[in-house]
């Protein structure tokens, strides 16, 4: 290990090889362009711009011609006139044939860029659906974080997927409702600039919860124009959005304010009374040394009522409709306030530092009743889950590239921490939201995660080898406020997560990859201290083998075979306040996706996933993993700027899947289609969108639950579900200025 660090330090200090042209690529407004592709037509040497738009091309000199291309920009032949250049690209229509498959671990991110360009998001739910193979479901009146499904995982609300926005974590550790709870509703969809995602645990910069994968959202640095829009639709639905550019199109600085307000009663017999308010302010600047600095503040709050999950037997016998309720006093309220500052600083043409620091204030209060009168035949089983949380944190990463005669290397050294302080994390048995019948759990939680990682990319021509390692330190502390005497419990744990990936790029149109790595998700502090720190950071061990292929200029295909093993663990059940074991599991599957541009304005995309998911230690036939997706597919046609018209037709299909361990109860699948169309005339856009175009009867979320109704003697275990949205039409008008 000592010799390794000596070699590393030596490499990072070496000078570039041969003559070099270095520079930056920007658009007409001065915004830096990431992942632009630069090729020296005289020597065939090439490079990509980094996050700051900077590049360095070796074997290049004055008089050479650089061919520069980037998705969404016109190609440019640039004649080198000095050793340092600034290249300006002009915006253009989206062209799939301009895509270059890059020799990097996150090469698949080009898929999300394509999808954002061709099918822009207009709801917070659609943001997560941009990740191929990821399904979501809402089952609490619109205010609760979505239930997530990916790679054979019922991720619940985020246990096995790490989600972040501008470097701020979205997942909540030791949350009152469930571990990893990730409420993304504070993001205004129109402000999303980039979606970075990866499946599996192969990324050193991603730690806690990144077992099935990660999703990292990046908001816009600036707005081209200001705009206001109003949407109105069925079920007393209203949404207004305001985007206000405060500084115009200055090249060195930008500032904007974004607002969103949503009201709806939903299709339910008992109105949801849902409302949500979002506010975001962001300032960005390019400093004299080409550093990029930004600071943002946001506020989100939401309240709602919910009909809850209903038992199939009541719908079958006609007692209630699919949109009825057993206990319509469910619901809740939540809020989140964020402050975030980030800096990307170039040190030289091959080195830069990026860092961000953040603070979040979060409140949550949820009322649920999943079992009705099973535990309390008189008052019912309603529960309250509540918490008041503060989150502090920082991420920093040093990036260094080294160019040798016949191979290149790059290094990312990262450090950071996250500290959560939660006051009065509560689970109580309640009546009609107003009376606390029993405090089941009540306490304060302090949890700290400090980490470091080293990621290395060694490029030998067409082959890139990517060894990496991550080190995480956790400290858990719980103060039980229901104990008769003062009781504060604490545990610490260290986790080492190695990764090893291979990427072979045959050319700019064909890439093969083998990825492998160990990841983990943390467990609730209440599990950690009660289980004396044992089996609290279960490992996931996984591998992917796949390709990214561009057989034709306007067609890109991605495919992968994968395997994932998850260790046994003990988990905290937030709805019951108990700890139960979760056995070892294995998942394997296949992913396939394609993107095709039929002409300048018409696009087609589809993704399909197959998964085989089983518990390892259970006997055959009793080893199904409840709600694990088996087969899924999504896709659609979209068109952009065809004589002023834009729109699309999309579908999503989720196959029937087991709802319990022996598959005796089945969660029914669904096939749902959505449609939207808009027309832009000068500065005004008119649009119509329809969810569930064919008015399909489907269950958005469903569980095998044992419950008892007030007039029942015995309990019944069966499907309890939240119905999916029926035919739902909205109209929209927007004005840009």
Go through the PLM ranges and name each one.
Residues 197-204, 213-247, 259, 267, ...:
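Short strand-turn segments of transmembrane beta-barrel domains in outer membranes
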Residues 286-301, 332-481, 505, 509, ...:
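Face-selective signature of the C-terminal outer-membrane beta-barrel domain
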Residues 344-346, 352-370, 505, 511-519, ...:
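Membrane-embedded beta-barrel scaffold of Gram-negative outer-membrane proteins
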Residues 55-58, 169-199, 218:
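Short acidic/polar hinge/loop motifs at secondary-structure boundaries
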Residues 399, 405-406, 474, 562-565, ...:
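Gram-negative outer-membrane beta-barrel transporters
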Residues 234-263, 268-307, 331-348, 405, ...:
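Transmembrane beta-barrel wall of Gram-negative outer-membrane proteins
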Residues 125-172:
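Extracytoplasmic beta-strand/coil segments of soluble accessory domains associated
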Residues 604, 656-657, 679-737:
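C-terminal beta-signal and adjacent terminal beta-strands/loops
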């Amino acid at each position: 290990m000592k010799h390794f660090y000596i070699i590393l330090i030596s490499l990072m200090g070496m000078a570039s090889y041969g003559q070099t042209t270095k520079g930056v690529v920007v658009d007409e407004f001065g915004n830096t362009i990431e992942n632009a592709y630069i090729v020296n037509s005289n020597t065939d040497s090439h490079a990509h711009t980094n996050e700051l738009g900077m590049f360095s091309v070796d074997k290049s000199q004055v008089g050479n011609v650089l061919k520069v291309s980037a998705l969404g920009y016109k190609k440019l032949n640039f004649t080198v006139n000095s050793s340092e250049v600034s290249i300006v690209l002009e915006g253009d229509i989206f062209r799939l044939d301009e895509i270059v498959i890059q020799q990097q671990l996150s090469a698949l991110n080009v898929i999300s860029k394509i999808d954002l360009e061709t099918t822009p998001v207009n709801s917070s739910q659609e943001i997560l659906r941009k990740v191929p193979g990821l399904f979501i479901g809402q089952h609490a009146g619109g205010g609760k974080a979505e239930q997530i499904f990916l790679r054979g995982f019922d991720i619940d609300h985020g246990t096995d997927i790490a989600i972040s926005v501008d470097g701020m974590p979205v997942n909540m550790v030791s949350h009152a409702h469930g571990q990893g709870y990730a409420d993304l509703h504070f993001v205004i969809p129109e402000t999303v600039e980039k979606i970075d995602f990866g499946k599996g645990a192969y990324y050193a910069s991603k730690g806690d919860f990144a077992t099935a994968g990660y999703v990292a959202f990046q908001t816009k640095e600036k707005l081209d124009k200001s705009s206001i829009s109003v949407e109105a639709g069925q079920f007393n639905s209203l949404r207004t959005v305001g985007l206000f550019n405060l500084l115009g199109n200055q090249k060195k600085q930008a500032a904007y304010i974004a607002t969103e307000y949503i009201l709806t009663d939903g299709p339910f017999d008992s109105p949801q009374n849902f409302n949500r308010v979002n506010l975001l302010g962001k300032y960005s600047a390019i400093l004299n040394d080409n550093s990029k600095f930004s600071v943002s503040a946001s506020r989100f709050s939401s309240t709602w009522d919910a009909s809850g999950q209903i038992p199939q037997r009541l719908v079958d016998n006609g007692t209630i409709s699919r949109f009825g309720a057993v206990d319509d006093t469910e619901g809740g309220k939540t809020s989140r306030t964020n402050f975030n500052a980030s800096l990307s600083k170039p040190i030289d043409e091959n080195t830069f530092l990026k860092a961000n620091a953040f603070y979040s204030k979060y409140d949550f209060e949820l009322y649920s009743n999943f079992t009705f009168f099973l535990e309390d035949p008189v008052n019912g089983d309603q529960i309250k889950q509540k918490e008041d949380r503060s989150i502090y944190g920082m991420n920093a990463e040093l990036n260094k590239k080294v160019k040798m005669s016949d191979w290149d290397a790059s290094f990312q050294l990262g450090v950071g921490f996250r500290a959560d302080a939660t006051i009065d994390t509560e689970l109580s048995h309640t009546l009609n939201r107003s009376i606390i019948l029993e405090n089941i759990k009540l306490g304060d939680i302090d949890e700290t995660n400090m980490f470091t990682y080293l990621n290395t990319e060694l490029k030998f021509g067409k082959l890139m080898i990517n060894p990496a390692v991550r080190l995480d330190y956790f400290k858990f502390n719980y103060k039980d406020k229901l104990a008769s005497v003062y009781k504060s419990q604490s545990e610490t744990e260290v986790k080492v997560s190695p990764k090893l990936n291979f990427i072979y790029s045959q050319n700019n149109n064909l890439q093969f990859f083998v990825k492998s790595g160990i990841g983990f998700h943390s467990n609730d502090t209440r599990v950690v201290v009660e289980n004396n720190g044992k089996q609290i950071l279960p490992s996931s061990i996984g591998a992917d083998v796949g390709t990214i292929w561009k057989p034709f200029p306007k067609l890109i295909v991605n495919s992968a075979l994968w395997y994932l093993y998850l260790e046994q663990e003990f988990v905290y059940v937030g709805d019951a306040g108990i700890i139960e074991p979760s056995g070892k599991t294995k998942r394997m599957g296949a992913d396939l996706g394609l993107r095709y541009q039929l002409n300048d304005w018409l696009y087609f995309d589809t993704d399909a996933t197959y998964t085989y998911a089983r518990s390892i230690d259970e006997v055959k036939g009793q080893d199904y993993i409840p709600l694990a997706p088996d087969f899924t597919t999504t896709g659609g046609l979209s068109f952009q700027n065809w004589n002023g018209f834009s729109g699309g037709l999309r579908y999503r299909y989720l196959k029937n899947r087991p709802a319990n361990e022996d598959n005796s109860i089945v969660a029914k699948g669904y096939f749902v289609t959505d449609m939207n169309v808009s027309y832009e005339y000068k500065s005004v856009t008119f649009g119509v969108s329809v969810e569930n175009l064919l008015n399909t009867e489907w269950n958005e979320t469903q569980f095998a639950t044992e419950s008892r109704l007030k007039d029942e003697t015995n309990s019944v275990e069966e499907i309890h579900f939240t119905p999916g949205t029926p035919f739902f039409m909205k109209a929209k008008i927007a004005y840009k200025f």
